[in-house]
Amino acid sequence: MSEANHKNIVVVGAGIIGTSVATMLSKVSPNWHIDMFERLEGAGIESSNENNNAGTGHAALCELNYTVEQDDGSIDASKAQEINEQFELSRQFWGNLVKNGDISNPEEFIQPLPHISFVMGPTNVNFLRKRYETLKTLPMFDTIEYTEDMETMRKWMPLMMENREPGHQMAASKIDEGTDVNYGALTRKLAHYLEQKSNVSLKYNHDVVDLTQREDGKWEVVVENRETKEKVTKIADKVFIGAGGHSIPLLQKSGVKQREHLGGFPISGQFLRCTNPDIIKQHAAKVYSKEPQGKPPMTVPHLDTRYINGKQTLLFGPYANIGPKFLKFGSNLDLFESIKPYNITTMLASAVKNVPLIKYSIDQMIKTKEGCMNYLRTFIPDAKDEDWELYTAGKRVQVIKDSEQHGKGFVVFGTEVVNSDDNSMIALLGESPGASTSLSVVLEVLEKNFADDKEAWEPVVKEMVPTYGRSLINDEKLMRETRRETSKNLHLNR
């Protein structure tokens, strides 16, 4: 591989996205030096931490919001195919890191687990049936099973069917090739790999407090040691901001044009966590349902088997909780300090247009554990208060922006990548399915920020992600070969 010119690259944030970007960049060339800064005392403590998310390997197997019913009644599965392909790219990357010995023991961060969709009521049952009929014709999803039979559902989800009253129309679909992913464990493995690299400097307890672009296009990045309060300035050719909820404030400090007409609304996730081992062992799947009518996709409830530190556990949620912090370990001033003259009209327009979202968030905020338990009983009729505890998980910041298609104050559900005009800065904003599609973010960083260095990075990418540049959606043989290989590398055939 030919060497690229020397580059100084700054990566902000040591979560799953930041460590993924830094890992790939570190492999491209020894002449590329990466300074990585994390404001907390270790990697993967905020949103990537295993206790702060549901750990779904988002592959559109059970998440119903990725398949959309059209006006004519047909199902558009194009988004589901896109998400599935993106997750396959991530699996290739992780699998080859294991194969090359860069990280080890994949069973510590990924486990095979069926993904199930479960709905009630004639309208939702009709939707799920049509979704099944559509997905069954697509090679990516052709192992999907469907049932409206209660006894079959009892085999798939025994805990959910126990003492459930008959008479309600129900349906379920299942794909066995799903996964539970411990993104915290994976992030820590990537960080450990980076700590051994000679061309990477990874510093914890270091906060990026300012970013200024010089006339020559380089960036001055001011970093504060949170323990000593000492500040240093790093000069960077490229900057990647993968700081979770802190990405919007950093983007604002950078002064790039793309910060305008852009804001964020912070939401905490709360989960019920089962504390009874006898209950936990009765369920082994991720079960997603359909969001209540008129509610945003973030309201989709799910019952998740999790594998954390070698132990099986069980979560239900999420329940939203609003508050001004952009990070779990953030400041109560975060939201207010993010409102600027250049985005206040965007924020106000969003407040007017999204009354149902605000009402939902307030309703969730005042919901007691009793209210949360009542919701859980739509999934587990026999759920007992003493077997579950309510806890606050991670923060996400819903991106609000102006859009030609949707007008002012549009709320973005999903992941948003923002590039400066000269592609010297990129910031990742938003929420799910970000972690699952982390490799797609890596590829976007390379393609947009390092287009002039393609000769250096393309061979590395093709080594780590063999299907790069080819379609898994349109090439069934390649898709099946890739799945077999990644399943072997990640020890999923167990």
Swiss-Prot record:
Disulfide bonds: none annotated. Its cofactor is FAD. The keyword Flavoprotein applies. Keywords: FAD, Flavoprotein, Oxidoreductase, Tricarboxylic acid cycle. InterPro entries: FAD/NAD-bd_sf, MQO. Pfam families: Mqo. GO terms for biological process: tricarboxylic acid cycle. It is an enzyme of class 1 (oxidoreductase). It catalyses: (S)-malate + a quinone = a quinol + oxaloacetate. Pathway: Carbohydrate metabolism; tricarboxylic acid cycle; oxaloacetate from (S)-malate (quinone route): step 1/1. One of its GO terms (molecular function) is L-malate dehydrogenase (quinone) activity. Its EC number is 1.1.5.4. HAMAP family: MQO (MF_00212). Belongs to the MQO family. This is Probable malate:quinone oxidoreductase 3. It comes from Staphylococcus epidermidis (strain ATCC 12228 / FDA PCI 1200). The lineage of its organism: Bacteria, Bacillati, Bacillota, Bacilli, Bacillales.
